[in-house]
Curated annotation (Swiss-Prot):
PANTHER family: CELL DIVISION CYCLE 20 CDC20 FIZZY -RELATED (PTHR19918), CELL DIVISION CYCLE PROTEIN 20 HOMOLOG B (PTHR19918:SF4). It comes from Mus musculus. This is Cell division cycle protein 20 homolog B. GO terms for molecular function: anaphase-promoting complex binding; ubiquitin-protein transferase activator activity. Protein regulator of centriole-deuterosome disengagement and subsequently participates in the ciliogenesis in multiciliated cells (MCCs). Residues 77-106 are annotated as: Disordered. GO terms for cellular component: cytoplasm; deuterosome. It is found in: Cytoplasm. Expressed in multiciliated cells (MCCs).
Length: 519
């Protein structure tokens, strides 16, 4: 009898998780095979950016020692590396050694390069265009005399040739749709807008509370806005010292004359971004900073109607901007705050880091402190030269119960800051930043989307959300409700004050804007 020794292997038992991942990988593999069979690999999608394309372009950029500016992949209109002095800027570099010059002697801003390069996936060499050529005049860097101005045929041809925009944030921009912005003055009885035909214009009024007596008055002007994004985390309205109002509508920035209530110009950025995410005027002069959904910050001169330069460095939506003389601070949804000195070629002089998206940035009136509000509910106070030092540590961090978006420094008390609470909070917080404690905290019973101080009347105006969707007025220092502006049918996203501090511009998510006489 022969004995045979049989070796038995232990049977491997697959878990449910392993089987699930096998099924997922099998489905992905089948999908990739179908895509290969349906079309040639040389064909380019005009909208979606695949991970392989993103990775290959990113590696090529790093190998060529060209800094990735404004997005994971280069922008469609990119300054030529050979002519762009700011492309070699580094975050670790300190501030410029020269002494800041007085603004009275004139602001000197380093202009953009003279050569623009149109990048594409074609195998041909990049096409270089001069500023004076007709093709550049049809590009995104233009002022439009009409709201609908724009060469749409050029954009369609660009898409059919496979020249796609590679600077889109890959996490959110897929499937995004561009909206053409419009700005129309309400002409009362002749207005054909929906709502005005049914007498909705008569519902707009200002009410002042004085005991049992209520005084009411109508707004100076009512404006219809098309393309205003209903986004709590954007800052798309600002009123300049030269009485010019800038409001971002879709892919354009409209400039409106606050004196004679007339529309002047609009900046069309439809080719290089999906929407404009933030605007702010320089305190002195006509320089306008524009943040885009692609992480770009552009500087424009409203008088000469020319673009001054691009400030690269962000990888996501730039939702907050704030000037401190010649230093521009920009905050993104990835939690980065960059400080740009617009007078020098290597503009980036400091960087701050947050864990969540930056919702708001405000420099104090004296320029000594910077406050930043984030989506994680942290209100952070930074020194005058944040990020440029060795450590770049904040002076104080004040936790809040909701995201910190509505925020403004007191004009007559430099160490007092007003912060509006979100939906879960609904309170107006007036803080002493030295102690970090609340001075007054009245409840508004709604989301505070925007706020601004009124120095003439010593009040605070807050843009409210549901259920009233009004602009509430609070008397300082008691913070009692003293009145309000009524008529908006959706939350009041943005507020801005005129340079003479007598009029208030309110813009709501229902597409209406009003100019109110506040004193």
């Amino acid at each position: 009898m022969e004995w045979k020794l049989q070796r038995t292997a232990r049977r491997k038992i697959r878990t449910e998780e392993e089987m699930l991942w096998e099924n997922i990988m099998r489905v992905l593999a089948n999908g990739m095979k179908q895509q290969r069979n349906q079309g040639s690999p040389k064909e380019l999608d005009s909208v979606a950016v695949t991970y392989s394309s993103f990775k290959s372009n990113f590696v090529k950029r790093l190998s060529a020692e060209i800094p990735v500016a404004s997005s994971p992949i280069t922008t469609r209109w990119q300054l030529s590396p050979a002519r762009d002095p700011e492309s070699s800027s580094s975050v670790e570099e300190g501030p410029p050694s020269h002494t800041p010059e007085s603004l009275a002697s004139g602001l000197k801003i380093t202009p953009a390069a003279d050569t623009l390069t149109l990048r594409s996936h074609n195998k041909n060499s990049p096409k270089t265009l001069s500023k004076g050529s007709s093709e550049v005049n049809n590009s995104t860097l233009r002022f439009c005399k009409t709201p609908l101005a724009g060469d749409r045929g050029w954009k369609e041809n660009l898409a059919t040739k496979g020249q796609r925009c590679l600077n889109q944030p890959f996490s959110t921009q897929k499937g995004a749709q561009q909206i053409d912005g419009k700005m129309h003055l309400c002409e009362e009885s002749r207005c054909v807008r929906t709502g005005c035909r049914f007498g909705a214009r008569d519902e707009f009024y200002l009410r002042r509370f004085s005991g049992v007596y209520h005084s009411t008055c109508q707004p100076e002007v009512k404006i219809h806005l098309t393309g205003l994004r209903n986004d709590y985390y954007l800052n798309t309205l600002d009123w300049s010292s030269q009485n010019l109002v800038a409001v971002a509508l879709g892919t354009s920035v409209y400039i409106w004359n606050g004196q004679n209530h007339s529309w002047i110009e609009n900046i069309d950025l439809s080719v290089c971004c999906h929407y404009v995410s933030s605007v702010t005027w320089m305190r002195e002069g006509s320089c306008l900073a524009v943040g885009t959904s692609e992480g770009e910050v552009q500087l424009w001169d409203a008088i000469t109607k020319k673009q001054l330069r691009n400030l690269h460095g962000h990888l996501s939506v730039v939702g907050a901007l704030s000037w401190n003389h010649c230093t521009l601070s920009s905050g993104s949804r990835l939690g980065r705050v960059h400080h740009h000195d617009v007078r020098v070629a290597q503009h980036r002089v400091g960087t701050l880091y947050h864990k969540e998206a930056v919702c708001s940035l405000k420099w104090s009136p004296d320029g000594r402190l910077l406050s930043s509000g984030c989506n994680d509910g942290l209100l952070t106070i930074w020194p005058h030269d944040p990020g440029a030092g060795v450590q770049g540590l904040p002076l104080k961090v004040i936790p809040q119960s909701t995201a910190v978006k509505a925020m403004e420094w007191c004009p007559w008390q430099s160490e007092v800051l007003a912060v509006g609470g979100g939906v879960k909070d609904g309170c107006l917080h007036v803080l002493d930043i030295n102690t970090g404690k609340n001075i007054q905290t009245p409840s508004t019973q709604s989301q505070i989307c925007s706020l601004i101080w009124l120095p003439k009347t010593k009040e605070i105006a807050t843009g409210q959300g549901a259920p009233k969707n009004d602009v509430a007025l609070w008397t300082c220092p008691t913070l009692f409700r003293s009145g309000g502006f009524f008529g908006h049918r959706d939350r009041v996203l943005h507020l801005s004050l005129s340079p003479d501090q007598t009029r208030l511009f309110s813009a709501a998510a229902d597409g209406t804007a009003c100019v109110w006489k506040c004193c």
